[in-house]
Amino acid sequence: MKKALTGCLAAVLLASASPMGAAEKISKEELKDKIAGAWIGQMVGNIYGLPFENKFVDEPASESRFPFGYTKNLDKLAKFDGAFSDDDTDVEYIYLMLMEKYGIEPTYANMRDGWMHHIRDRVWLANRAALGLMHLGYTPPFTGAQELNPHWYQIDPQLINEIWAYTAPGMPEYAVGKSDWAARITSDSWAVAPTALYGAMYSEAFFEKDVRKLIEKGLRYLPEDDRYAKGVRKCLDLYKQYPDDWVKSRQIIAKEFYTDEDPMTKTIWNADLNGLMGILSMLYGKGDFQRTLDLSCAMGFDCDNQAATVSGLLGVMYGAKALPKDLTMPIEGWTLPFNDRYINVTRFDMPDASIQDMINRTYDLALDVVKANGGKVQGNKVIINPKAKFNPPLEFCIGPNPDLTVGVPADYSFACAANKSYKWALTAGTLPAGLSFDNGTLTGTPEKAGRYDITLSLTGNGKTLAKDFNLVVKPQNLAMKADTIYTNVRVLNEAVLDSCWITFGKPMYAKTVDVINDGVKKGAGSVFYSLASASKNPKIDYFGYGWEKPVAVNMIELNTGCLEEFGGWFTSLNIQYLDEEGRWRDVGKYTSTPALPSTDIVFFQPHFAQFLLEFPEVTTRGIRVLLDTKTQDHWHKYTKNVSNFTSITELGVYDLK
């Protein structure tokens, strides 16, 4: 956990920002027009690009199809008599409401509450995985951590975080810091860099109208050796080498970031891949809104996201007044962009809105951000501090409990990218023998099994917080000494899996059930699917162990794996042991830490969860868990006939005295 939660941009934000000169000035009218351009531009791009989402992968769309037009979405615009919500704009609307409710710098805990209340369906990939972890009790950035969110490398944060930057006009360092902070709700490592770069460009675009210069300014805020930064520089070089051949440039970038991508992160939704398609669209669009929009669709992959992001960015650069009226008012009789209507079709408790009202509210928040960070308003002028920096709110971030076992080296960080720079201390309780605590990190090798209550404090921003934690050190894992594995499915049916709509790199999947007691809980080859046939029939899976000699058991550690859209989780769980006559008996009541999911709804299921299941001690030659697999519908023509399997990485067995 320690490695995944390290902020890759921290050093850059502290040391590398180039001098930006004196305070920036912009009129209130121009500021509001550019904020309007961000909202309206994103709506144009999202609705325009949606029909082409995931359509062009191996090859881009032909330029002969330009301009694409709204195609089938023109009818939807007419039906709703305005713009309609989608994930490229609706999460930002939620963030607008959260800033109004909690202030311009909400905490991760505030963000979690907002997500859980408003987002109940229509999320995918990293966003869905983050939501599931929130319902398990975690807060960001653990919800985006590499070890817990198997979609950490996908595009999700780029398309939902632009608002942090267009409420920070001309404050690029602040915008980058806040965008990076928010990106970690769903993502980690190099996958947050596109969000940070676009955050820098959105903020800089209030005062920069040259596309190439804008990209180069944004690059100042990424580490020199960052993977995405290298890709952006390659795009700039390709544009110089092939100024009239965007297809060639797209081919080269797609080969490196898709065809030849690491199999574990090779998807059409990869963050760097899609973020670079947006950069190419901007370069070859040369600042022309319509051409940039068409190119962002033609580049392919998850193209509606690029279309929304770059269209909003050009909207900031040139202002809403410069956006083509045939795109903002495509329905006869409309006299305002999208008829001044934003209709919610995606989120719970998110009211329909006047677009102008959304713009006004965002403008007010932008002024609040400016004034809170060394800027001010004088008459009709907004005076901005371009060197403002974002300091994350002080808070404990909540993730899984430390995974501690006698004799197994531990390295767990309670600290994360948002609070690792603050002062940590152990203020109460005694650590397990063999462990030490320093600056938020627990290290060492536990020597004695048991339960240990400790209190940690966190100091910064002029205040101190304290929080209690319960550490459980498990004894040696009896599963490692099992003589047999009990299960109803021993081998993954790879042919069935390959025919389904899967969203992970193929190295993730183990071929046999033998991995459940190999000690590996994450990463390539760690996840076993009990997928035996192309079936959607209800079934109960079981996993367990047998020993030649009886063992005492009172705890099972169930480690689930990554989940597909069409299955992998369970609706109920039971635990059984072998009695002296060789019959399976229920262990009786058991407790689970954390609690098992309270619903089997697909959107609320956590990936890579660890459940400690405790029950009265039994002495037995066999133990197993029975899992009632979930039947989940899916839209894909083959996948819709496949479900009812369990995703598992490890099953531990213990006797904790």
What are these regions (language model features)?
Residues 50-83, 89-93, 108-125:
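Active-site-surrounding "flap" and adjacent substrate/cofactor-binding loops of secreted or lumenal enzymes
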Residues 418-440, 467-469:
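Surface-exposed or secretory-pathway low-complexity segments enriched in glycine-proline
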Residues 463-474:
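C-terminal edge beta-strand
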Residues 26, 143-152, 163-171, 180-185, ...:
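Accessory "access/gating" subregions that flank catalytic or transport cores
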Residues 521-590, 607-657:
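Aromatic, loop-rich ligand-recognition surfaces of beta-strand-rich domains
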Residues 44, 48, 55, 59-68, ...:
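Catalytic phosphate/nucleotide-handling subdomain of diverse soluble enzymes
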Residues 441-449:
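Extracellular/luminal low-complexity segments enriched in Ser/Thr/Pro
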Residues 450-462:
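A short beta-strand micro-motif common to beta-rich folds, especially ectodomain repeats
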